Amino acid sequence: MEAVDLLANVSVTGLLLFWGDCEFFVSEILYDENLSENAQETRKVLLNNFRVVHVRNPQEFPFPSDYKEEDGSDDNRSSSLGRSAQSDDASLASDNQDDGIPEYFGDIPPVAAQDIVNVLKQGYLEKKRKDHSFFGSEWQKRWCVLNNLVFYYFGSDKDKQQKGSFYISDYSVQLVTNLRKDSRKTSCFEFFAPGRRPFQFTAGSPQEAKEWVDQIKIVLRDLSSTVIPVDDEEEEEEEEETYDDIEGEGGPPLPQPLSGTWGRGGDTGAADEEDEDIYEVLPEESPDSADGSMERNNKPEYANYYQGLWDCSADEPDELPFQRGDLIYIISKEYNIYGWWVGELNGAVGIVPKDFLHPAYIL
């Protein structure tokens, strides 16, 4: 029995000596070395982990007599040792450790938080770690950014590359209440898919979580459809409606139809004012834009008319400028997933930002 106790004491003593050597090497030896940026970050993480162990286990791992905390620019580090909550100390190390190896899925390249384009929603959320250790908290504060294809998460809104990212088209999203047991359990949502790792987040409030989920669902719906949606009921109504019916809605004046087409401005043909039925006219060639003529179905396509919400100037040659209130015909939604549609205004054709438009007619 005495031999066992002796071995146990030797093991503990050896562990403490080894711990002290490791801490001395990281804090003192590496201090004078010319380390790369990644190595400096790793050293900071290790120093912070040593400090967390000292704070949480002062009897077994007391602070060295000559301990001093280094000044640094790492926002995750504490400026004093006066923190008493263990969860706070754990979160310091956790913030540095989580996603230590950046998680990139598919062909998503590294990108700075400020350089993401087509941002639809962004803000701070708490992300649940894939696995958490002795040093780690289960949740970490992350700057999250949603665009029309990818969900990114960063350590902060100033980070030069993401800690992780994934294509949202591979997932579904839902609000959940079983991820936490505290007062924020109703502020959680998750991305999930069969056979894939889930991604789980906590927002600042239930309302904020719902806003995230609603926005993500809108993007998922856009990704699943690249054509202009038309309900069956709307289609039936379009077959029965006449110009007089539409004009009764009180919307903007309707463009006169071309021969063989509907909903296009021009002077090559007009409907008989006394004829209340929709009739077909044999299609004939008519000049259009410089790109050539475009065919339309022989029925009204008022669902494809949108009105400008704000003035929009063209930054590129392929963009279509328009003013607030302009009536724009949407030719296609081929680039819907990028936030752009193809529109026509006064014979000019170009891409327009869909967020600057809203339906012109209530059908």
Swiss-Prot record:
- Start and end residues of each PH domain: 118-221
Q: Which gene encodes it?
A: skap1
| Feature: compositional bias, Low complexity | 84-94
Q: Which superkingdom, per the lineage?
A: Eukaryota
| Acidic residues composition bias: residue spans | 230-248
Localization of this protein: Cytoplasm; Nucleus; Cell membrane
Instruction: Tell me what this protein is called.
Output: Src kinase-associated phosphoprotein 1
User: Keywords of this protein's UniProt record, alphabetized?
Assistant: Adaptive immunity, Cell membrane, Cytoplasm, Immunity, Membrane, Nucleus, Phosphoprotein, SH3 domain
**Which species is this record about?**
Takifugu rubripes
